A protein has these predicted regions:
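A cross-family phosphate/adenosyl-ligand binding-site feature
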Residues: 2-50, 60-61
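Charged helix-capping and loop-helix junction motifs
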Residues: 80-86
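Active-site-proximal beta-strand/loop segments in catalytic clefts of secreted hydrolases
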Residues: 9-13, 44-45, 68-71, 101-105, ...
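Glycine-rich phosphate/pyrophosphate-binding loops
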Residues: 92-114
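Electrostatically charged, flexible surface regions
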Residues: 113-205
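Extracytoplasmic/secreted cell-surface and envelope-processing proteins
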Residues: 16-18, 74-78, 108-111, 151
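Alpha-helix C-terminal capping segments
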Residues: 54-60, 86-97
Length: 205
């Protein structure tokens, strides 16, 4: 993206399910490289620690914090447990706009779709971000369906479901080309219908 500077600060190890947990005391960090070869800072702590290290130790002054793209969708009752969303919530508490993006698991993980969603959102909201008027009341959470057939449908904004039904596997959408009989009313229904779900998540859950 032209005119955009990306600073990578992330946990050194997988910290799935750690919510907005933070480490007491000093958090160690060191130079690191992502799996795709991008230089950044590896934080020996939780995702929310990475936000604190970026702001307080490295002196980063971001217009936006982007957390993800995570492997595994974070919808319904999974959202409060998510380290990806937890880092974004930590940014909100510091007055910084934040996005969280999550995709599927294994072969169904469409990271490209997640990254594209983030890039399109940044482009659409660039003026607000640079002007300091972007909202900081909620995290904008993106979830990409794990399509085994077809490709994700349009972006749809929906609220968070209370819980994932016991018989539903949100990590896999069998056929994203099928059109649901009714419009989705929450993030779980959106994923299972093959839609790219956008959901507002408050800082406190």
């Amino acid at each position: 993206m032209p005119g955009v500077e990306v600073v990578v600060v992330a946990p050194a190890e997988n910290q799935s399910g750690t919510s907005d947990r933070t480490t007491a005391g000093t958090v160690r960090h060191r130079p690191g490289t992502t799996a795709s070869g991008v230089a950044g800072t590896a934080v020996e702590g939780f995702p929310a620690d990475a936000v604190a290290v970026a702001l307080d130790e490295l002196g980063v002054l971001p217009d936006l914090v982007v957390s993800g793209v995570n492997e595994g969708q974070n919808v319904a009752n999974f959202a409060p447990l998510s380290g990806t969303i937890g880092a974004a919530r930590a940014a909100l508490r510091r007055g910084i706009p934040a996005l969280a993006a999550s995709a599927g698991l294994g072969p169904q993980a469409n990271f490209t779709a997640g990254a594209t969603l983030v890039a399109e959102w940044i482009t659409a909201h660039r003026g607000e971000l640079l002007g300091g008027t972007a909202q900081t009341a909620t995290v904008t959470s993106f979830n990409v369906p794990g399509c085994t057939v077809g490709t994700p449908k349009a972006v749809i904004e929906v609220p968070r479901a209370p819980a994932v039904p016991a018989n539903v596997n949100v990590f896999v959408t069998a056929n994203c080309d099928l059109v649901p009989a009714t419009a989705p009313t929450n993030d779980v229904e959106a994923l299972m219908g093959g839609y790219l779900a956008v959901t507002p998540i408050p800082a406190e859950l």
